[in-house]
């Protein structure tokens, strides 16, 4: 069993929608509802904690009711940064020894991916899902190519990311004490010298971040429903 944390207090500035991107529609259903439905079907998910902007609480609650989400969903106040939201949410994890952290804007996560992440988290204490980088990656300095990075060992990291609650709490507390801001939760665990296991993600498991991503998400959904 695990508790799911969804940091959902972001403004989504790159989307340029003027509102929380999780409320935007894919095939007439809000992004966050697609995401919640993926975990709604998973019996191992004991509880969902969503760190939100308090001003949007009634909007989220209305979606839960409208779309019949039956899983136990708890709303808490999110922080200024994603990292702050996850740390705050960890204080409310009481029922399980393991936690998954997932981007609310990744609506195409699969049950297979969820459980592979959870299995490795139980084995190693921490796990991520990732896919090989397909593009050539270059390091650029002052608008000029500095070097081409060998991509064979590079991975594009996704969510969900899985952890023992005790380990993730230790990593967040260490980062907080040092004023360290990581790009994801796994980076905080790496920082304290702990191993993070890797499982195969999916190129379909996109994070809907820009208007172009909305179009891609629509096409993915149509393919899934054929």
UniProtKB/Swiss-Prot annotation:
Catalytic function, reaction form: 2-C-methyl-D-erythritol 4-phosphate + CTP + H(+) = 4-CDP-2-C-methyl-D-erythritol + diphosphate
Chain segments annotated as transmembrane: none
Enzyme Commission number(s) of this protein: 2.7.7.60
Keyword Cell inner membrane on entry: no
One function term, GO molecular function aspect: 2-C-methyl-D-erythritol 4-phosphate cytidylyltransferase activity
Enzyme class (EC, first level): transferase
Residues flagged as site, Positions MEP for the nucleophilic attack: 151, 207
Alphabetized InterPro entries for the sequence: IspD, IspD/TarI, IspD/TarI_cytidylyltransf_bact, ISPD_synthase_CS, Nucleotide-diphossugar_trans
SUPFAM superfamilies listed in its UniProt record: Nucleotide-diphospho-sugar transferases (SSF53448)
Function as written in the Swiss-Prot or TrEMBL entry: Catalyzes the formation of 4-diphosphocytidyl-2-C-methyl-D-erythritol from CTP and 2-C-methyl-D-erythritol 4-phosphate (MEP).
Protein family per UniProt: Belongs to the IspD/TarI cytidylyltransferase family. IspD subfamily.
NCBIfam families on file: ispD
Name of the protein in its database record: 2-C-methyl-D-erythritol 4-phosphate cytidylyltransferase
Gene that specifies this protein: ispD
């Amino acid at each position: 069993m695990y508790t799911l944390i969804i940091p959902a207090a972001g403004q989504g500035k790159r989307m340029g929608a003027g509102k929380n991107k999780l409320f935007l529609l894919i095939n007439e259903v809000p992004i966050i509802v697609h995401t919640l439905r993926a975990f709604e079907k998973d019996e191992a998910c004991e509880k969902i904690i969503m760190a939100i902007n308090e001003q949007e609480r009634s909007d989220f609650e209305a979606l839960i009711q409208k779309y019949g989400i039956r899983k136990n969903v708890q709303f808490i106040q999110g922080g200024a940064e994603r990292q702050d939201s996850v740390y705050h949410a960890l204080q409310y994890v009481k029922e399980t020894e393991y936690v998954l952290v997932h981007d609310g804007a990744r609506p195409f996560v699969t049950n297979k991916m969820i459980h592979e992440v959870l299995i490795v988290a139980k084995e190693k204490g921490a796990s991520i899902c990732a896919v090989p980088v397909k593009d050539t990656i270059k390091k650029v300095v002052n608008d000029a190519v500095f070097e081409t990075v060998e991509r064979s060992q590079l991975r594009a990291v996704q969510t969900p990311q899985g952890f023992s609650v005790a380990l993730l709490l230790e990593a967040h507390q260490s980062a907080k004490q040092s004023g360290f801001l990581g790009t994801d939760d796994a980076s905080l665990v790496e920082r304290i010298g702990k191993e993070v296991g890797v499982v195969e993600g999916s190129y379909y498991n996109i994070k809907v971040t820009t208007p172009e991503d909305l179009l891609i998400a629509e096409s993915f959904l149509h393919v899934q429903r054929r």
